[in-house]
């Protein structure tokens, strides 16, 4: 049975089994032609998606909006707390209940971990977590996996390095959890000691017997990996600007570093300067393809959740 059809909401990638992920990736592949042609279908005609974004977002918000419209639906939403009654003191719960009355599904982004789960417990429509603090970002993980499979033909048997802020980066937390579902995957975590992968993520990998190695520099692993997944070092996490500049400068990927190598480079974006622009026109650059892949993948997610609500049909 496909577990995704039992889920009312998508809150954490930990709720997925491999077959659920494979189902979404297959659905995304079928919908990619619609995404590329920039045409629309009628899969979700008459449906409305509520976008509740309490934290800044460009790609996630726009790709969800694009995905819904490509499926024939429409969107309503807020982009920050200033644009809704939360700024007047209204509770998140009341705002969510109001959105529930107007929408067939909700997409939530919030700076606090756990808000999406809280909202999913008080509304009857599907809820999609679009990032909660330093917690999870499950739909980003699905499009990351889609990109890897599309570019390399598989996810099994790959060596993948996650680089940058692994402590606070929710994308790498979710991605690590998901990669643990695949066979013979080896993970390399490249980060300064202040920003290493949280122990709870490492604990989950240990339980699944997923091999991983923690290193301090990109140079230690660059000859070993198939995928380099780069994230920005977050300036706001450092009290000392000099320390930030020192660490940031040690985690920059450029064209010269990758000469003669077949590694693909991914990034959830936005980038600051951790990937040099001289990489943009090389075979290594997959981060712009990755950004586009958000549309077919999120189309697949929306179609799966909304079209099957409220009966949640099961597929054997």
Curated annotation (Swiss-Prot):
Keyword Flavoprotein: no
GO terms (BP aspect): 'de novo' pyrimidine nucleobase biosynthetic process; 'de novo' UMP biosynthetic process; amino acid metabolic process
Keywords, alphabetical: Pyrimidine biosynthesis, Transferase
InterPro entries: Asp/Orn_carbamoyltranf_P-bd (IPR006132), Asp/Orn_carbamoylTrfase (IPR006130), Asp/Orn_carbamoylTrfase_sf (IPR036901), Asp_carbamoyltransf (IPR002082), Asp_carbamoyltransf_Asp/Orn-bd (IPR006131)
Group of enzyme by EC: transferase
Pathway assignment: Pyrimidine metabolism; UMP biosynthesis via de novo pathway; (S)-dihydroorotate from bicarbonate: step 2/3
Catalytic activity: carbamoyl phosphate + L-aspartate = N-carbamoyl-L-aspartate + phosphate + H(+)
Functional note: Catalyzes the condensation of carbamoyl phosphate and aspartate to form carbamoyl aspartate and inorganic phosphate, the committed step in the de novo pyrimidine nucleotide biosynthesis pathway.
A Pfam cross-reference name: OTCace
Similarity-based family: Belongs to the aspartate/ornithine carbamoyltransferase superfamily. ATCase family.
HAMAP family per the UniProt record, alphabetical: Asp_carb_tr (MF_00001)
Name recorded for this polypeptide: Aspartate carbamoyltransferase catalytic subunit
Organism, as annotated: Methanobrevibacter smithii (strain ATCC 35061 / DSM 861 / OCM 144 / PS)
């Amino acid at each position: 049975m496909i577990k995704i059809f039992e889920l009312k909401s998508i809150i954490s990638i930990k709720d997925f089994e491999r077959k659920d992920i494979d189902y979404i990736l297959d659905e995304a592949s079928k919908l990619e032609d619609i995404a590329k042609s920039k045409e629309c279908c009628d899969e979700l005609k008459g449906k409305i998606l509520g976008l509740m974004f309490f934290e800044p977002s460009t790609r996630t918000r726009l790709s969800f909006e694009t995905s819904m419209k490509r499926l024939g639906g429409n969107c309503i939403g807020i982009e920050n707390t200033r644009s809704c009654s939360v700024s007047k003191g209204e509770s998140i719960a009341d705002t969510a209940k109001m959105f529930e009355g107007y929408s067939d599904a909700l997409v939530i982004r919030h700076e606090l971990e756990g808000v999406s789960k809280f909202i999913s417990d008080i509304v009857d429509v599907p809820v999609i977590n679009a990032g909660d603090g330093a917690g999870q970002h499950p739909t980003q993980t699905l499009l990351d996996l889609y990109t890897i499979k599309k570019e390399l033909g598989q996810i099994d048997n790959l060596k993948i390095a996650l680089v940058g802020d692994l402590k606070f980066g929710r994308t790498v937390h979710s991605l690590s959890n998901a990669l643990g579902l695949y066979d013979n995957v080896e993970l390399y975590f490249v980060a300064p000691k202040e920003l290493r992968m949280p122990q709870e993520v490492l604990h989950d990998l240990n339980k699944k017997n997923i091999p991983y190695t923690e290193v301090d520099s990109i140079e230690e692993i660059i000859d070993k990996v198939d995928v380099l997944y780069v994230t920005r070092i977050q300036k706001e996490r450092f009290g000392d600007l000099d320390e930030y500049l020192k660490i940031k400068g040690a985690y920059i990927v450029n064209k010269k570093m990758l000469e003669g190598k077949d590694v693909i480079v991914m990034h959830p974006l936005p980038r600051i300067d951790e990937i040099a622009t001289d990489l943009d026109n090389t075979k290594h650059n997959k981060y712009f393809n990755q950004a586009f892949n958000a549309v077919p993948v999120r189309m697949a997610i929306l179609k799966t959740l909304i079209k099957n609500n409220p009966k949640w049909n099961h597929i054997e």
